[in-house]
Amino acid sequence: MARIAGVDLPRDKRVEIGLTYIYGIGLTRSQHILAETGVNPDTRIRELTDADISALRTAVEAYQVEGDLRRLENMNIKRLQDIGCYRGRRHRMGLPVRGQRTRTNARTRRGGRRTVAGKKKAPAKK
């Protein structure tokens, strides 16, 4: 099993797909890395040589991935919250940040529905 950037890549996947298991590397970046290193995208990870793995390792180190990327994102959000801008306040309140409506929808960001006590029904007329 190849270990790149602290992530064990699945042995039976193609290299192109296996690299996307690293946080911060999607399909497009994976294709760029493979073109840069000259590794065939269709080979399986178990078939890679040690030279291929070390080439991939050095190519991935050029990007911010995994813990560094997560830390950078959290620092950016914390900076927005510290300066007290609109986006920072929305992050702090757990609401959508990019201008989406919240009267309806936005359930992912706001969490599950809360039940609110409704008013009592009027007594039935006789």
Swiss-Prot record:
Cited Gene3D superfamilies: 1.10.8.50, 30s ribosomal protein s13, domain 2 (4.10.910.10)
Biased composition (Basic residues): 100-126
Entry keyword annotation includes Ribonucleoprotein: yes
Region (Disordered): 92-126
SUPFAM superfamilies: S13-like H2TH domain
Molecular function, one GO term: structural constituent of ribosome
A matching Pfam family: Ribosomal_S13
InterPro entries membership: Rbsml_uS13_C, Ribosomal_uS13, Ribosomal_uS13-like_H2TH, Ribosomal_uS13_bac-type, Ribosomal_uS13_CS
Keyword Methyltransferase among UniProt keywords: no
Single Gene Ontology BP annotation: translation
GO cellular component entries: cytosol; small ribosomal subunit
Keywords of this entry: Ribonucleoprotein, Ribosomal protein, RNA-binding, rRNA-binding, tRNA-binding
Family listed: Belongs to the universal ribosomal protein uS13 family.
Function summary: Located at the top of the head of the 30S subunit, it contacts several helices of the 16S rRNA. In the 70S ribosome it contacts the 23S rRNA (bridge B1a) and protein L5 of the 50S subunit (bridge B1b), connecting the 2 subunits; these bridges are implicated in subunit movement. Contacts the tRNAs in the A and P-sites.
Subunit description: Part of the 30S ribosomal subunit. Forms a loose heterodimer with protein S19. Forms two bridges to the 50S subunit in the 70S ribosome.
Name recorded for this polypeptide: Small ribosomal subunit protein uS13
Top-level taxonomy: Bacteria, Bacillati, Cyanobacteriota, Cyanophyceae, Gomontiellales
